[in-house]
Amino acid sequence: MTKRALISVSDKTGVTTFAAGLVANGFEIISTGGTRTVLEEAGVPTLAIDDITGFPEMLDGRVKTLHPNIHGGLLAKRGNQAHQKALTEQGIHFIDLVVVNLYPFKETILKPAISEAEAIEMIDIGGPSMLRSAAKNYQDVTAVVDPSDYEQVLSEISSTGTSQLATRKRLAAKVFRHTAAYDALIADYLTTQVGETEPEKQTLTYERKQTLRYGENSHQQATFYQSVVPVSLSIASARQLHGKELSYNNIRDADAALRIASEFTEPTVVAVKHMNPCGIGTGKTILAAYRQAFEADPVSIFGGIVVLNRPVDQATAAEMHQIFLEIIIAPSFEEEALALLSQKKNLRLLTLDFHAQEKKAVELVSVMGGLLIQEQDTVVENDQAWQVVTERQPTPAERDALNFAWKAVKHVKSNAIVLANESQTVGIGAGQMNRIGSVKIAVDQAQAAGKLQGAVLASDAFFPMADSVEYAAQHGIQAIIQPGGSIKDQASIDLANHYGIAMIFTGTRHFKH
């Protein structure tokens, strides 16, 4: 009996060559609409779908392959006599291979000003149904959803007359992943349309971007997946211009640096090590900002990740070229700057769009047996609503420094303390189990660098005791910003008043675990 393949694709890549190869191996081709036109124009003979179903397309093409003559031919087991008898009685032929990719729903909803009605018309019904039928019957039927699989399938058919069972099983798994992701995207779109934020069942869709050499450590396997709906301001969307492939740790550190850089509109440079900033600097030019970030901690920046929110010019590149860095990310690189930095073969240089405005994003954290989902901490705070709780008001310069430090401290691992001036972090205490411990680390760092005088202090959460204020006062800190909210707030306020310290309560905590 002549073998049959049903081909109906929105992505026409390689389809004419593949179909011609099938015909050369004795297959009849059944096809629909635009795919059939493309194949016929390429000289590939086809049968129209309504020649098989005996029923015309209807409802503006919504119904064309949903028919027993199609799904019976896909689902019938070849070794089952009852199935064969049923097909014979109904005049249905086996269909041995299905090549389908789905309506471009994702591409449609990413277009600007797309109406809901337009999006709904791009929800494919017949395609997923055929793919699922073929994939369920992978013992006998080959289901192909990706043009990258054409070559292997055709090679096996040319060699043995059929695809290998292992290949069919692999492709079946690929089909179910594909249709599940497709349905998840539709569900997410409709969920967003109705404003639901906590659906009872959560489905997440990502595409493999890169197989990594290893994970956090060399004995751990790792893969980098990208959201099917791209996020422009993300390491996943960055374009790499030079250097080795990114590692697992590179990606996490770069993500942390990008999140910090996105807080600032003025020229800003962020240096990150192990998910924490080691230096943040702003300036009138990107060179001035880089110098501020470098001088914040010239030791820790070595081997770090640097993000600049302005194009890299030759002068800035020349200074970065003097030290060892893992990654530099910027909106762009001037030609001379790129040439200079590219002399370091292992230095990774990436660009991305810093002007992209994304909808509110969520972040995911896996726990044993579960998944935590929360909104990203991107709350926009109104500093005019902050409350000065002490007798002394901060000076304008202190206010600027407090604002800068507050933007920085939310990106430091809790318990987090940042000492800063108006344009530079000068001491960072991160990840300590008690807050006074982080205060001491930040003060020691600033003191060692000779930058403690005039620095202000930011704390990501309230002071549970007044000891942090006491220690800060003993080391000359004259302005503090914190969320407030402790049952012992008054003790901290009284101590600040005693030392003439200005203190602001923001009312917003920024824990980072």
Curated annotation (Swiss-Prot):
Highest taxon of source: Bacteria
Domain MGS-like per the UniProt entry, residue ranges: 1-145
SUPFAM superfamilies tied to this protein: Cytidine deaminase-like, Methylglyoxal synthase-like
Gene Ontology CC: one annotated term: cytosol
GO molecular function annotations of the record: IMP cyclohydrolase activity; phosphoribosylaminoimidazolecarboxamide formyltransferase activity
CDD domains named among the record's database cross-references: IMPCH (cd01421)
Gene3D superfamilies per record: 3.40.140.20, Methylglyoxal synthase-like domain
Listed pathway(s): Purine metabolism; IMP biosynthesis via de novo pathway; 5-formamido-1-(5-phospho-D-ribosyl)imidazole-4-carboxamide from 5-amino-1-(5-phospho-D-ribosyl)imidazole-4-carboxamide (10-formyl THF route): step 1/1; Purine metabolism; IMP biosynthesis via de novo pathway; IMP from 5-formamido-1-(5-phospho-D-ribosyl)imidazole-4-carboxamide: step 1/1
Keyword Transferase listed: yes
GO biological process: 'de novo' IMP biosynthetic process
Record's keyword terms, sorted: Hydrolase, Multifunctional enzyme, Purine biosynthesis, Transferase
Written domain comment of the UniProt record: The IMP cyclohydrolase activity resides in the N-terminal region.
Record-linked NCBIfam families: PRK00881.1, purH
Name of protein: Bifunctional purine biosynthesis protein PurH
Gene: purH
